[in-house]
Curated annotation (Swiss-Prot):
This is BRCA1-associated RING domain protein 1. It comes from Mus musculus. The modification Phosphothreonine is found at T381. The lineage of its organism: Eukaryota, Metazoa, Chordata, Craniata, Vertebrata. Residues 195-204 have a biased composition (Basic residues). Homo- and heterodimer. Heterodimer (RING-type zinc finger) with BRCA1. Heterodimer (via ANK repeats and BRCT domains) with CSTF1/CSTF-50. Component of the BRCA1-A complex, at least composed of the BRCA1, BARD1, UIMC1/RAP80, ABRAXAS1, BRCC3/BRCC36, BABAM2 and BABAM1/NBA1. Interacts with UBXN1. Keywords: ANK repeat, Cytoplasm, DNA damage, DNA repair, Isopeptide bond, Metal-binding, Nucleus, Phosphoprotein, Repeat, Transferase, Ubl conjugation, Ubl conjugation pathway, Zinc, Zinc-finger.
Length: 765
C-alpha cells in the first residue's frame, strides 16, 4: 500500500487561510465575520430582514417580526404551516435585547465605514419594519385572558396579487378574540352599514376634512346619542374615537403599558408614543384648548415626523371632545407608521385603573420573567422625538410647570409601576430627568415594593441612578424580599453603580429577608473588595431622608392626639388646633401625625406606642406652647422625644421595614397588665404576625424556615429567631423556658420595651 506523501508548506508560500478568516483586512476582522454570521441568525423567517419585535407562534421554532405574522395569528406558521393557537403567541424580549446589543456592536465595529454604510445599517436596525402590520397583545387582569389588537396601515411593503388591490383600502384584520365581544347597539350597526353603502370609496382624510367644516354647537357637545354614533362611523381601516377631556397636569400612561379593559369591539388603529412625549405641562394643555382638536393634532403629527417616520403627537384638551367609554390598551413600544396616515389618526386617552383592579404578581417579575411580558419595556435608546424642536421648546419653556401633586401617583399600570418606573427600566434619561423636574416622587414603590432606583440598578443604567440620587432617592430602601438597590446592583454585576451607591451611603451590611448581604451575592473580587471595606457615611442616609421629607411634613395635614395630658393641656391643644388649622383626634388612627406627651419621656400608653410604631412625631408639650406663642408651626426636631420615637420616625422616612418585620408571635396564657387585644394591635402595627397555634421547637418544619428578623442585631443569634412565645411575666407562675433555634420564649414586658425603644432588645438568659 503506497504511503501518502507528507504535506510540506514552503517558507515562501503563505499558510492557507482559516475558514473563518474574512476576505477583507483591517481591525477586528474576525469579530466582523462573527457578527455577520450572528446577523444571519437574527433574521425573520418570512421577510428575511433583521427581526423587529421578534415573535414566536409556539408550535414551531420559526421566529418572525410582529408585523409579518399579523395575517397568520390563530391559523398557523406561514413557513412550515404548523397549526398555532392564538394564545401561544409570545414576544421574545430577550432576543429583542440581543438584537439591540448587536446593533450597538455593529456601530462600534463599522465606525470607520462610509456615512452611507452607517446610514443603511441604522435604518436596517431602526426602522426597517416600520411600514409593516403590527400586532399588540396584553394581559387583562379583569378577565384573566390575553387580548390582541392588530394595527393595519394602508401601505403594502410586499407585492400582493392584483385581486387583493381593491380590498386593501377598506380591509381590516379580524380574528377570534380571547373574550366575548362587547354588544353593539343595532342602531349603530345599521348606521355603519348605511354609511358603508352610501360612501363606499370615501377616504378617511376626506371624512376628516368634512368633520372640520361641521358647525360647532353652543357647548361643543353632542345633543343626542344618534349624533355620537354617527361620528364614530367611518369606512376604511380606522375607527376614530372621540377623546375625553384631559385634566390639567394629567399624564398619559399609554407608553408605560397601563392595562385598561377595552369597551369598544373591533380592531382599533392607534399609535404608541415615546415616553417623554406623553408628558404635557398644564400650560401647554391650556393653550391647546383654544384651537380645534383635529387641526392641532394634524399640526403636531406633521411636526413630530418630518421624515415620514412619525412616532406620535401631543394630545391637547379640546372643547369639541366628548367623553367616550372606549379605553384602548397599548403596549409600551412605539410603532412607526407611514406618513400617509399621519393626518388621519385620532388618539385616544386611557384612564387609570380603579384601585380594586390593581394586582400584584411579584413572582413573575424581573429579568427572564419580565422579559417575556408584553407590557414590559425592553431597554433601548431614548426616543428620537426627544431631540426635535417641539420637545426642546417644551423642556425650555417657562410654561412647563410642576405637575399637580398626587396625579402621577394615581397613574399606574397593573403592576403599580409609574412613569418614572418605566423610564428607569428603559434607561430613558431625558424622560427620567423631565419627570423628576416636574415633581415625581423618586421613592415611590410599585406593588412589589421596588422603587425606580431598584429598577435602574438592576438594569445597569448608571446615568439614571445618578439622576435619581441627585433628586434625593433613598439608597437603603428595601424592595421585594427586602432587597436593597445595592443587592440588585451586586447581583447584576454593575460595579460602577455599586461605587455610586456606596459613595451615597448605601449600607454594606443590609440584609434581605433571608439574611443575605450584598457581598454574599457576588464572586467578583473587585466588587467584594468594595463591599468588605469598613462602613463610612453612616449618617448620610439619615440626613438625606430628613431633607427629603421636610417639604412633605410642611405641606401635609396636621392631625394631633394627646396622651396622658391634663384637662388644661387638652384645652391648649384644642386652641392650637384652631391656630394651625389642624385636626384633633380622640382615638388613634392612621391619619395621626403628632402625638403630644406631657413629659420628656414617652409613656407606655396604647396611643403613644401606636404613635411610635407608626413613625409619628412624639413631641413634648413645650412644642404646643411655642406654637401658641409664635402663632406658626415650629420645628419639631427641637421638641422631639429622643430614643425610640426618633428612631421610629427616621425608620419610616427611610421607608425601611417595620419593627417586627419577619417575626411571629404566639400569645400564651392570660394577659392582665396589657390586655390581649392591645397586644394584638401593637404586633400588627409593628409588622409582626400572630400565630394561632403554639410553635413546636422540635419540629423540622419550624426549624427549617430560612427567614430572619430585619431589625435584629447582625452579630446576635436573635436574628435567626423568628417565632416568639409571649407570656405574662408579672405573676409568680412562669411557663417552661424555651430557647431552641427558631423558637424563643419571651415575656410581655420585653415586647413593650422593644416597642418603646424601637429595637429588638436582647433576651436575658
Amino acid at each position: 500500500m503506497p504511503r501518502r506523501p507528507p504535506r510540506v508548506c514552503s517558507g515562501n508560500q503563505p499558510a492557507p487561510v482559516p475558514a473563518m478568516e474574512p476576505a477583507t483586512d483591517g481591525l477586528w476582522a474576525h469579530s466582523r465575520a462573527a457578527l455577520a454570521r450572528l446577523e444571519k441568525l437574527l433574521r425573520c423567517s418570512r421577510c428575511a430582514n433583521i427581526l423587529k419585535e421578534p415573535v414566536c407562534l409556539g408550535g414551531c421554532e420559526h421566529i418572525f417580526c410582529s408585523g409579518c405574522i399579523s395575517d397568520c395569528v390563530g391559523s398557523g406558521c406561514p413557513v412550515c404551516y404548523t397549526p398555532a393557537w392564538i394564545l401561544d403567541l409570545k414576544i421574545n424580549r430577550q432576543l429583542d435585547s440581543m438584537i439591540q446589543l448587536s446593533s450597538k456592536l455593529q456601530n462600534l465595529l463599522h465606525d470607520n465605514k462610509d456615512s452611507k454604510d452607517n446610514t443603511s445599517r441604522a435604518s436596517l436596525f431602526g426602522d426597517a419594519e416600520r411600514k409593516k402590520n403590527s400586532i399588540k397583545m396584553w394581559f387583562s387582569p379583569r378577565s384573566k385572558k390575553v387580548r390582541y389588537v392588530v394595527t393595519k396601515v394602508s401601505v403594502q411593503t410586499q407585492p400582493q396579487k392584483a385581486k387583493d388591490d381593491k380590498a386593501q383600502e377598506a380591509s381590516m384584520y379580524e380574528f377570534v378574540s380571547a373574550t366575548p365581544p362587547v354588544a353593539v347597539p343595532k342602531s349603530a350597526k345599521t348606521a355603519s352599514r348605511t354609511s358603508a353603502k352610501k360612501h363606499p370609496k370615501k377616504s378617511v382624510a376626506k371624512i376628516n376634512r368634512e368633520e372640520n367644516l361641521r358647525p360647532e354647537t353652543k357647548d361643543s357637545r353632542f345633543d343626542s346619542k344618534e349624533e355620537l354614533k354617527e361620528e364614530k362611523v367611518v369606512s376604511c381601516s380606522q375607527i376614530p374615537v372621540m377623546e375625553r377631556p384631559r385634566v390639567n397636569g394629567e399624564i398619559d400612561l399609554l407608553a408605560s403599558g397601563s392595562v385598561v379593559e377595552p369597551e369598544c369591539s373591533g380592531s382599533l388603529t392607534e399609535v404608541s408614543l415615546p415616553l417623554a412625549e406623553h408628558i404635557v405641562s398644564p400650560d401647554t394643555v391650556s393653550k391647546n384648548e383654544e384651537t380645534p382638536e383635529k387641526k392641532v393634532c394634524v399640526k403636531d403629527l406633521r411636526s413630530g415626523g418630518s421624515n415620514g417616520n412619525r412616532k406620535g403627537c401631543h394630545r391637547p384638551t379640546t372643547s369639541t371632545s366628548d367623553s367616550c367609554g372606549s379605553n384602548i390598551p397599548s403596549t409600551s413600544r412605539g410603532i412607526g407608521e407611514p406618513a400617509l396616515l399621519a393626518e388621519n389618526v385620532v388618539l385616544v386617552d386611557c384612564s387609570s385603573l380603579p384601585s380594586g383592579q390593581l394586582q400584584v404578581d411579584v413572582t413573575l417579575r424581573r429579568k427572564s420573567n419580565a422579559s417575556d411580558d408584553p407590557l414590559s419595556l425592553s431597554p433601548g435608546t431614548p426616543p428620537p422625538l426627544l431631540n426635535n424642536s417641539t420637545h426642546r421648546q417644551m423642556m425650555s419653556s417657562p410654561s412647563t410647570v410642576k405637575l399637580s401633586s398626587g396625579m402621577p401617583a394615581r397613574k399606574r399600570n397593573h403592576r403599580g409601576e409609574t412613569l418614572l418606573h418605566i423610564a428607569s427600566i428603559k434607561g430613558d434619561i431625558p424622560s427620567v430627568e423631565y419627570l423628576l423636574q416636574n415633581g415625581n416622587d423618586p421613592n415611590v414603590k410599585d406593588h412589589a415594593g421596588w422603587t425606580p432606583l431598584h429598577e435602574a440598578c438592576s438594569h445597569g443604567h448608571l446615568k439614571v441612578v445618578e439622576l435619581l440620587l441627585q433628586h434625593n432617592a433613598l439608597v437603603n430602601t428595601p424592595g421585594y424580599q427586602n432587597d436593597s438597590p445595592l443587592h440588585d446592583a451586586v447581583k447584576s454585576g454593575h460595579i460602577d453603580i455599586v461605587k455610586v451607591l456606596l459613595s451615597h451611603g448605601a449600607s454594606r451590611n443590609a440584609v434581605n429577608i433571608f439574611g443575605v448581604r450584598p457581598v454574599d451575592y457576588t464572586d467578583n473580587e473587585n466588587i467584594r473588595s468594595l463591599l468588605l471595606l469598613p462602613e463610612e457615611n453612616e449618617s448620610f442616609s439619615t440626613s438625606q431622608c430628613s431633607i427629603v421629607n421636610t417639604g412633605q411634613r410642611k405641606n401635609g395635614p396636621l392631625v394631633f392626639i394627646g396622651s396622658g395630658l391634663s384637662s388644661q393641656q387638652q384645652k391648649m391643644l384644642s386652641k392650637l388646633e384652631t391656630v394651625l388649622k389642624a385636626k384633633k383626634c380622640m382615638e388613634f388612627d392612621s391619619t395621626v401625625t403628632h402625638v403630644i406627651v406631657p413629659d420628656e419621656e414617652a409613656q407606655s400608653t396604647l396611643k403613644c406606642m401606636l404613635g411610635i410604631l407608626s413613625g409619628c412625631w412624639i413631641l413634648k408639650f413645650d412644642w404646643v406652647k411655642a406654637c401658641l406663642d409664635s402663632k406658626v408651626r415650629e420645628q419639631e426636631e427641637k421638641y422631639e422625644v429622643p430614643g425610640g420615637p426618633q428612631r421610629s420616625r427616621l425608620n419610616r422616612e427611610q421607608l425601611l421595614p417595620k419593627l417586627f418585620d419577619g417575626c411571629y408571635f404566639f400569645l400564651g396564657g392570660n394577659f392582665k397588665h396589657h390586655p390581649r387585644d392591645d397586644l394584638l394591635k401593637l404586633i400588627a402595627a409593628a409588622g409582626g404576625k400572630v400565630l394561632s397555634r403554639k410553635p413546636k421547637p422540635d419540629s423540622d418544619v419550624t426549624q427549617t424556615i430560612n427567614t430572619v428578623a430585619y431589625h435584629a442585631k447582625p452579630e446576635s443569634d436573635q436574628r435567626f429567631c423568628t417565632q416568639y412565645i409571649v407570656y405574662e411575666d408579672l405573676f409568680n407562675c412562669h411557663p417552661e423556658r424555651v430557647r431552641q433555634g427558631k423558637v424563643w420564649m419571651a415575656p410581655s414586658t420585653w415586647l413593650i420595651s422593644c416597642i418603646m425603644a424601637f429595637e429588638l432588645l436582647p433576651l436575658d438568659s
